[in-house]
Amino acid sequence: MVSPLVINITYLLLMLSIVLSFVRLARGPSLPDRVVALELIATLVVAVIGVHAIDTGIAAFLDIAIVLALTAFIAAIGFARFLERGGPRDD
C-alpha cells in the first residue's frame, strides 16, 4: 500500500498542474495553445483518476481513465485534421 502522505502530495501536485493548465487555457494566445492546454487537462484528469484508483483500490476507475484518455486522443486527432484543412488558428 502506498503511504497516505505520498498520495496527498501527488493529489496536490496534480491539482496545481490542473490550475496552471486552466490559466493557460484562458490566456491563450492562439487556438492551438488552448487545445494543447485542454489536452493537458484531460491527461492530468486521467492521472488523478489513476491515483484515486490506487488510493481506493477500486480497479473500475482505471476503465474510466482509459475511456477518457481515448476520448482526448480522438479529440486531438480531430483538431489536427481541422487545422490541416485550413481552419482558423487565431495567430
Annotated model-derived regions:
Residues M1-R27, L31, V36, I49-L62, ...:
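Flexible extramembrane loops and terminal tails that flank transmembrane helices
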Residues I64-F79:
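Alpha-helical membrane-embedding segments
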Residues L12-F22, I41-L44, L70-F73:
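Hydrophobic alpha-helical transmembrane segments of multipass integral membrane proteins
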